[in-house]
Amino acid sequence: MIELKNISLSYANSHGDSQLCHIDLTVKKGELIILAGKSGCGKTTLTRVLNGLCPQFYPGTLTGSYLLAGKDALKMPIHQLGTMVGSVFQDPRSQFFTTNTTDEIALGMENIPLERAVMQKRIELVCAQMNIERLLNRRIFPLSSGEKQLIAIASICAMEPKAVSYTHLRAHETLRHL
């Protein structure tokens, strides 16, 4: 499913210092992996490589190979990679584009685009699976940080990507909904 071979990355402003050096990683369908390490060790950078933000939005030099579902992910347009790898960031507010929870969950599917009836079924299914129906049709910004993260996760899961990367999940509260 995900296969990284000899991935190295140096950000454009890093004066040649590598943020990732010769990373090999294979993640099979259905596997869950956890990247753990000290602050600054490259966990977020690796996530940015997986979802295509590096080097497209965070300029730098990326070498090695990255296969996603057997396809060369480094040659995919960012919009295609974005539908295959969903990302939930440390601060979910940074990825919200609406002020309503249901609208936010639907937004990514609107961009695919999917028919309204399909989107509604996916919203209902994902929210039921995560046991977060109580969060539908609410204003986003008064929600707790954990609830915001759950809405971000639901919005990604509703798009049915092949892989999802999470940066800094809020421990047990968020994990029990997955």
Model-based region annotation:
Residues 65-80:
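ABC ATPase NBD Q-loop/coupling interface
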